[in-house]
Swiss-Prot record:
Taxonomic lineage from the root: Eukaryota, Metazoa, Chordata, Craniata, Vertebrata
Disulfide bonds: none
Principal location: mitochondrion
Class of enzymatic activity (EC top level): translocase
Compartment(s): Mitochondrion inner membrane
Domain of life: Eukaryota
Entry membrane topology: Multi-pass membrane protein
Protein function: Core subunit of the mitochondrial membrane respiratory chain NADH dehydrogenase (Complex I) that is believed to belong to the minimal assembly required for catalysis. Complex I functions in the transfer of electrons from NADH to the respiratory chain. The immediate electron acceptor for the enzyme is believed to be ubiquinone.
Protein name, as recorded: NADH-ubiquinone oxidoreductase chain 1
Pfam families in the cross-refs: NADHdh
Catalyzed reaction equations: a ubiquinone + NADH + 5 H(+)(in) = a ubiquinol + NAD(+) + 4 H(+)(out)
Chain ranges passing through the membrane: 3-23, 69-89, 100-120, 135-155, 171-191, 223-243, 253-273, 293-313
Stated family: Belongs to the complex I subunit 1 family.
Amino acid sequence: MYLINVLSLIIPILLAVAFLTLLERKILGYMQLRKGPNIVGPYGLLQPIADAIKLFIKEPLRPATSSKLMFTLAPTLALTLALSLWIPIPMPYPLVNLNLGVLFILAMSSLAVYSILWSGWASNSKYALIGALRAVAQTISYEVTLAIILLSIMMTNGSFTLSTLTTTQEHMWLIFPLWPLAMMWFISTLAETNRAPFDLTEGESELVSGFNVEYAAGPFALFFLAEYANIIMMNALTAILFFGAMHNPMFPELHTLNLITKTLILTMMFLWVRASYPRFRYDQLMHLLWKSFLPLTLALCMLHVSAPATFAGVPPHM
């Protein structure tokens, strides 16, 4: 694999993340009846560049009592994993066409828990540690439903390869037959990416800023990039799973445009949710998953496993 292939994937993602921060600030501004960033460049369009320069020229301070190696390693690991999640995403062709692309995404997103845990523990601050423990409990819990929902979709798809979902959804998007799963998937992705109303890890009122409270400058920017790269990746995955983009081999660009548009609409929904809803209480968050989502997803998964056999039909690609 050539370096240019990897760079042509990473650079657009980082640019998308930069402008997503601007989009978020603008949308939140207009929803709160104010302008948002509008000084740097025309309509504030150069604000992300100014933010990046400001963050990376500041001195990265490290608490005297922190664990030096882990403190530095955690943000690096977070961004590396966030970018590696994009490897099997078909846009329309993935960087590496993995046979078990879905399992790869699940494994990588599970590993991201370590970066949060290390950052909280290495900071040697009680606020950071409480934030990290909350984040880990939340991420691990919601990954259970994400995995079960993915399994149900793969049963319908008949293969663990993400590229085949385009063929499966040629005649009908999977959101129509699987709409209860799609609703739970969307809410679980909100929780998985620590977004409002599930941003308990960053509860400013009680935890100052969450697991990254001791981070400043460059390392903080890496966490920030990782979080937003994960948001875009989750939305791209949602678009692929439930809103399969039409793929014409003659015009692969159309597939990319289609996917980008759907991802953007879903990302706008993430921002809309953030502007509209208050934060959940921690026990409500856990009850929602273990008492509502888990039994429902398990029942629907059983249905999708048994339905093809019951009706003597076979899923496509079997």
